[in-house]
């Protein structure tokens, strides 16, 4: 089927109290793995690319990969720009054909975050492309993204932000972090519930790799509708490739070792689709 926007699938997730996994992809094999997992479990899915991934292979390459994967799939697939760090990059993604765009103004002042988010929302509206924003700051470091120590989302600011921007979904900072955790993260679940009380749009959880599955499931019960995974996909792919090459040190065919990495990613994605509750929701 054609690529879908995230609005429709996230609203269904919100209505039916589950979440959709959004998986950061770095190459063709990861795109194939994520969509294969979604097909097998009859789950809607979101493919994501970060600015650093876009630098590696450009927006149009990843869009083309996602478009072909979606056309071959029998489940809804969206292609999302994760952590778009400028209005210009967001517009490039819009022109290429991305069906969902995040504009990340979380390191700007509250007023400037509203301003840039509103500009992207207004620009995307004629194409009915979904827009995600972030309020508060998810900590940690991943790719070219450095969230520092992070800063929690204030529920009343979240309400004002959504009202003034008209954004379609909101990433909230409740204690998660990008990259690899040094210890078990401690999430402020009560804060999440407070945000959910005053914000009507779907909420997004970033920095989920390494968060215990039962904690993620509790976040979904408290209103999270989109759950982002990135670091653990890289680990899974690299694990498969490394193990194959360790057993076959003379291997020179990328198809052979990359296919093992692809299978590791597929297994990981399937496990997380069960966690977020999206199985059989396509």
Model-predicted segments: where are they?
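Alpha/beta enzyme core
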Residues: 4-12, 27-52, 60-76, 84-198, ...
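Cofactor-binding active-site loop characterized by glycine-rich and histidine/acidic residues
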Residues: 56
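Active-site-adjacent C-terminal substructures of enzyme catalytic domains
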Residues: 186, 191, 198-201, 254-262
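Glycine-rich beta-strand-to-loop/alpha-helix junction loops that act as flexible
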Residues: 206-209, 229
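Extended, intrinsically disordered, low-complexity segments
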Residues: 244-282
């Amino acid at each position: 089927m054609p690529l879908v926007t995230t609005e429709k699938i996230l609203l269904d997730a919100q209505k039916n109290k589950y979440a959709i996994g959004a998986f950061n992809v770095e190459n063709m094999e990861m795109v194939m793995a994520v969509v294969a997992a979604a097909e097998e479990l009859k789950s809607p899915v979101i493919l994501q690319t970060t600015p650093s991934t876009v630098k590696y292979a450009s927006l149009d390459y990843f869009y083309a990969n996602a478009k072909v994967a979606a056309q071959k799939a029998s489940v809804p697939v969206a292609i999302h720009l994760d952590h778009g760090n400028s209005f210009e990059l967001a517009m490039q993604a819009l022109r290429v054909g991305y069906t969902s765009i995040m504009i990340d103004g979380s390191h700007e002042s509250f007023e400037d975050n509203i301003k840039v988010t509103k500009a992207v929302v207004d620009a995307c509206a004629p194409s009915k492309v979904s827009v995600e924003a972030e309020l508060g700051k998810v900590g940690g470091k991943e790719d070219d993204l450095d969230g520092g120590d992070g800063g929690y989302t204030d529920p009343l600011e979240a309400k004002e932000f959504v009202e003034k921007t008209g954004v379609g979904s909101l990433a909230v900072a409740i204690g998660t972090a990008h990259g690899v955790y040094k210890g078990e993260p401690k999430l402020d679940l009560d804060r999440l519930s407070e945000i959910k009380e005053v914000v009507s749009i779907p909420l997004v959880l970033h920095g989920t790799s390494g968060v215990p599955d039962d904690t993620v499931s509790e976040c979904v019960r408290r209103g999270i509708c989109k759950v982002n995974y990135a670091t653990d996909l890289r680990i899974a792919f690299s694990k498969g490739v490394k193990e194959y090459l360790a057993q076959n040190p003379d291997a020179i065919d990328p198809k052979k070792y990359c296919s093992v990495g692809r299978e590791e990613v597929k297994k990981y994605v399937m496990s997380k689709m069960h966690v977020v509750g999206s199985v059989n929701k396509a």
